[in-house]
Curated annotation (Swiss-Prot):
Expressed in different cell lines (at protein level). Pfam families: HPHLAWLY, MAP10_N. The lineage of its organism: Eukaryota, Metazoa, Chordata, Craniata, Vertebrata. This is Microtubule-associated protein 10. PANTHER family: MICROTUBULE-ASSOCIATED PROTEIN 10. The keyword Transmembrane helix does not apply. The keyword Cell cycle applies. GO terms for biological process: cell division; cytoplasmic microtubule organization; mitotic spindle midzone assembly; positive regulation of cytokinesis; regulation of microtubule-based process. Residues 34-43 have a biased composition (Acidic residues). Interacts (via middle region) with microtubules. It comes from Homo sapiens.
């Protein structure tokens, strides 16, 4: 015990810079064989042909195992010669050993460091290496300075050039190398005390704890200063880290050489059977050489300066629990034993949650016996699992996330943690098939009653709300289907001002009125997004469905170039929801009506408030008698714009005085709007007198006259442009024909319409002189698309209603064109209108007379006025945001003076 306490740990670091050989003195194979029999402690791998030199340098310190240093290309590879006979190594080895300082001092004085240059002949198993040269390097000076009685320091280093001689004493070359001997003290011995016991069949070598402690040599990077030598860097021994050849060696007292080397976590061991010094047989030496061919020159950081053994990074989530090996045994020692038992037998791996290849990816480590490990691992597993569950229970959001993930991957939750009552609704799905059942059960088993009740309330509320949402969505879908037949579903447009569930619930409690407004806006946005897709591909079957639902027998529209108008028509008829309200009355009409009523209130409330003002505005801008409200649904883009009008109207300064009117007869309004829309469409397409006859008996609620008229749709410049363009087209074509000049142009305009629509929601109103009519016009060809944007909001008559243009002739042409269109409509339609319409008619008569010359002779001005006003108001009803003429227009002079400066009566 006293001897072991007095032992110290020493480090010997060796670096070979280069070797020079005299080519003429290279030994013959026969001579080499004789020399090797005497130098059997030198080892090494494959050799090349005599033409290629495959050298290796062997070092032997006292009776410790031999250290081999190879050229950079590794063992068996022909060494590169910068000039003939010179081989650059630049590599070295480092070893640790334990001895009593006095013993080491005494032995180093007597025994030098044996250095040999070997030639590795080719063949497998590797033949006996050939000795090319050898030299003895005295370590007496180092022993005096490090462990002698007058030791001057803990380390001594030396670099020099030493001559090589063969067995006959002839000089064969030179070797340049450096060495350093370091005293590491006794503090680190505790890390090397773990015994390594193994038996080798045939060799019969067994290493006992005592022998191991006495002759243990571990790897250490030569470039790393020892703890006691922090102030003395390596100096001349500048060994590149990448070139260090580190090999762990274990030697027994019985003169056995046990050489174990580690390469990338693989275990390979070599045991050289005991013999007296140089008396080992050649076969055991060859075996060592073969084994060490691939194992040397591998840099592995020694465990000396690490608290834990380094392990390869396991793949993520492969092993939940890893058992840390005790640090007493270096991993190289473990790897050195061939029969060593692995730490990860199946019994140990069974305690892992996910047994996998991770166990094989770690270098084997010698730890406690397997049964002890199993017990500890099982306890650790259970404890870790319990801790994890407890932690998750304190983090409800994380718990919810885990449950959601398990659902996504169809992995049932083995032991679901406590579910926070406020998050219980997360586990519910529409069909109630999700893990909410398990969640509920765990809640009840783990939560208090009050918590459960809270969770139940939350669940019920959220469920009810979700049900309502789903119902609304279904209604939307159903109405869309019924109105749009089998048309392709349009992808949702981007949400402008989204109404989240949280906001909806909060508003329901705090500000129901604002909730209504938000819902209307959302409806409006939905319609617009639907229109974007349906505008171009709505079959006429949609119109048929609508007409049948409205119980009015209107002629169906031809499918030629008015599909777009049909699409917009769907939107115009107060969107699919309103339509569904009309003919899905028993199931969904109540909810739809309510929503629609609120929407109509807001959208048409602006119409109503502006009702009085809008008539003036509409009539005055309209050079033609037709009020703005005569938005031709026949115009493809017009339908889209009717919606636009509603948001714009909100910005009007007109007083909201007729919101209540909206609610009076929502159902009536819906039917009327739909009928009017149908009538408009049929009028465009068929132009027959019977088009509007079924509408004639409809009741007109106040909203019909009240639809708002917003002036912000165009500037005077744009209006004049549209007038010119339209005028040019109208002169040569029938007014109706000009309205539908080309489907493509309508399409382009409608696209613009939609874009302008969104922007118009929050845009400030434009000049009062700019009529909505021009905005409603989509029938103008693409060449006039700029003007079309403004004109799209109203029918052809709306075109005429645009404010004055530079050329009055164009205005007159526009008026005449609109009047002629009105005339046609008058022939086709006979509608009951209120007395307010008649007064409007009278006030507009001067305009009619003005443009009467352009009307067909068979139509009277009165008819024109009649049809135009009725048409105008009917069309106004066909969409939420459509324009309307107010009843307050007393005289056309007012309109002309206020809205048409520069226009003389």
């Amino acid at each position: 015990m006293a001897a072991s306490l007095s032992e110290r740990l020493f480090s010997l670091e060796l670096l070979v810079d280069w070797v020079r050989l005299e080519a003429r003195l290279l030994p013959s194979p026969a001579a080499a064989v004789e020399q090797e029999e005497e130098e059997e402690e030198k080892e090494q791998g494959e050799a090349s042909s005599p033409r290629g030199l495959c050298p290796a340098v062997a070092f032997r310190l006292l009776d410790f195992p031999t250290l081999l240093v190879y050229p950079p290309d590794g063992p068996g590879a022909p060494a590169a010669e910068p000039w003939p006979g010179v081989i650059r190594f630049g590599r070295g080895k480092s070893c640790l050993f334990r001895l009593q300082p006095a013993t080491l001092h005494c032995r180093l004085l007597r025994t030098p460091l044996a250095t040999l240059l070997l030639q590795l002949p080719p063949g497998r198993p590797t033949p006996t290496p050939q000795l090319l040269g050898a030299c003895d390097i005295s370590l007496a000076t180092a022993a005096h300075r490090v462990v002698g009685p007058a030791a001057s320091g803990c380390s001594h280093r030396h670099r020099g050039r030493f001559p090589l001689h063969n067995r006959v004493g002839e000089r064969t070359g030179d070797i340049a190398l450096a060495y350093r001997l370091t005293d590491l003290g006794s503090r680190l011995l505790s890390q090397l005390e773990r015994p390594l016991t193994f038996t080798r069949t045939g060799g019969g070598a067994e290493v006992s704890p005592q022998t191991q402690q006495e002759r243990q040599q571990l790897q250490q990077p030569a470039s790393q200063p020892s703890p006691k030598e922090a102030d003395k860097p390596l100096g001349e021994l500048e060994i590149p880290e990448a070139q260090k050849d580190l090999k762990e060696m274990v030697k027994s007292k019985a003169e056995c050489d046990n050489v174990g080397s580690v390469e990338n976590g693989k275990t390979n061991s070599v045991v050289t059977c005991s013999g007296a010094g140089n008396g080992r047989n050649v076969s055991s030496l060859n075996e060592e050489v073969t084994e060490l061919d691939m194992e040397t020159n591998i840099f592995c950081p020694p465990p000396l300066y690490y608290t834990n053994l380094t392990q390869e990074k396991p793949p993520p989530a492969q092993a939940k629990i890893t058992i840390e090996p005790q640090m007493n045994a270096p991993e190289e020692m473990d790897d050195a034993s061939p029969e060593k038992k692995r730490v990860n037998p199946p019994a140990h791996r069974s305690c892992l949650k996910h047994p996998s290849s991770a166990a094989h990816e770690h270098p084997p480590m010698l730890v406690n016996p397997p049964h002890i490990q199993n017990i500890g691992a099982t306890n650790q597993t259970c404890q870790t699992e319990q801790n994890r569950i407890n932690t998750i229970r304190q983090l409800p959001l994380l718990n919810a996330l885990l449950v959601e993930l398990s659902l996504l991957y169809d992995q049932p939750v083995t032991s679901p943690a406590h579910i926070h009552p406020h998050l219980a609704w997360l586990y519910r799905t529409e069909d109630k098939k999700s893990p909410e059942s398990s969640a509920k059960s765990t809640c009840r088993s783990e939560a208090k009653k009050d918590k459960r009740s809270v969770g139940g309330c939350e669940k019920s509320v959220s469920l009810q709300y979700k049900k309502n949402q789903i119902e609304n969505y279904k209604e939307d879908k159903y109405s869309e289907k019924s109105s749009g037949a089998l048309h392709k579903r349009v992808p949702k447009g981007r949400l402008l001002y989204g109404l989240t569930n949280t906001l909806r619930l909060r508003l329901k409690l705090t500000n129901p009125d604002m909730l209504v407004v938000h819902e209307k806006r959302e409806l409006y946005r939905k319609r617009q997004s639907q229109m974007l897709g349906t505008k171009f591909r709505i079959p006429s079957s949609k119109v048929k469905l609508l007409s049948s639902a409205e119980q009015s027998q209107k002629p169906q529209l031809p499918e030629d170039k008015y599909l777009d108008s049909d699409a917009s028509f769907t939107e115009n008829s107060d969107t699919s929801r309103q339509i569904s309200g009309v003919f899905d009355e028993p199931s969904t009409s109540k909810e739809t009506k309510l929503k629609y009523a609120t929407e109509k209130k807001t959208v048409d409330c602006s119409k109503n408030r502006i009702n009085n003002v809008s008539l003036e505005e509409v009539v005055s801008p309209a050079n033609s008698i037709i009020p703005e409200r005569l938005t031709p649904t026949n115009i493809l883009g017009g339908n889209v714009e009717m919606k636009i009008q509603s948001p714009c109207v909100f910005q009007q300064d007109a007083v909201v005085d007729r919101i209540v009117d909206k609610e009076i007869d929502i159902r009536q309004v819906k039917t009327t709007d739909n009928d009017i829309l149908m009538a408009d469409i049929s009028d465009k397409r068929t132009g027959k007198n019977s088009c509007y006859e079924n509408i004639s008996e409809l009741k007109y609620s106040d909203d019909l006259s009240s639809p708002c008229y917003s002036e912000d749709f165009c500037t005077s410049e744009d209006t004049s442009r549209s007038f010119k363009a339209h005028d040019s087209s109208s002169r040569t074509e029938n007014p109706k024909h000009s309205q539908y000049t080309s489907k493509s142009s309508d399409t382009g305009v409608s696209k613009k319409k939609n874009s302008s629509d969104r922007s118009s929601i929050l845009s400030p109103p434009f000049s009062a002189g700019s009529p909505v009519h021009s905005y409603r016009k989509f029938h103008i060809s693409k060449t006039q698309d700029k003007s079309l944007e403004e004109a799209s909001s109203i029918s052809a008559s709306d075109l005429s209603s645009t404010h004055w243009t530079e050329q009055k002739e164009n205005q007159i042409d526009q008026n005449s064109m609109h009047n002629s269109e009105i005339t046609k409509r008058a022939q086709d339609i006979s509608v009951k209108t209120r007395s307010s319409w008649k007064s409007l008619e009278k006030s507009q008569s001067p305009q009619t007379s003005q443009v009467s010359s352009y009307l067909p002779s068979n139509v009277s001005e009165l008819n024109v006025l009649d049809s135009s006003t009725s048409d105008h108001f009917e069309e106004g009803n066909d969409d939420v945001g459509s324009l309307n003429i107010s009843k307050q227009c007393k005289d056309i002079c007012e309109l002309v003076i206020n809205k048409l400066p520069g226009y003389t009566m």
